From Swiss-Prot:
Quaternary structure annotation from Swiss-Prot or TrEMBL: Heterodimer of an alpha and a beta chain.
The gene coding this protein: cgba
Compartments, record wording: Secreted
Protein name per UniProt: Gonadotropin subunit beta-1
GO CC annotation terms, alphabetical: cytoplasm; extracellular space
GO BP term, example: G protein-coupled receptor signaling pathway
Originating species: Fundulus heteroclitus (Killifish)
Length: 114
């Protein structure tokens, strides 16, 4: 029974508290002297990645990171000629880290548990 439970937990780990997923966030901004709150979605979470004990210069392990598909929306503020264009994540997924647009290195930090 414990083996079945552990297998189920591991299978669900990708969608658990650390899995790559959409998250609603609010970002305070100021335009034309008015303070507005932008409500959008971002991608957050961790993806499975191997971190070898021995680092070979010939073969680096593939680092997987939480990426997403994005679109942009525009918020118009009444009485203000300036609008706010902001990104909105529409889908999140784990993919190989691309060094052209992402800082791909080890994470030396304490990761709290759920």
């Amino acid at each position: 029974m414990q083996l079945v439970l552990m297998a189920a937990v591991l299978a669900l780990a990708e969608v658990g508290c650390f899995g790559c997923h959409l998250k609603n966030v609010s970002i305070p901004m100021e335009r034309c002297g008015q303070r507005v709150c932008i409500h959008t979605t971002i991608c957050e979470g961790l993806c499975f990645s191997e971190d070898a004990v021995f680092e070979s210069p010939d073969e680096a392990p593939e680092h997987r990171v939480c990426n997403g598909d994005w679109s942009y929306e525009v918020k118009h503020i009444q009485g203000c000629p300036e609008s706010i264009t902001y990104p909105v994540a529409t889908n999140c997924y784990c993919s190989a880290c691309n060094t052209k647009d992402t800082y791909c290195t080890r994470l030396y930090a304490h990761i709290p548990s759920c």
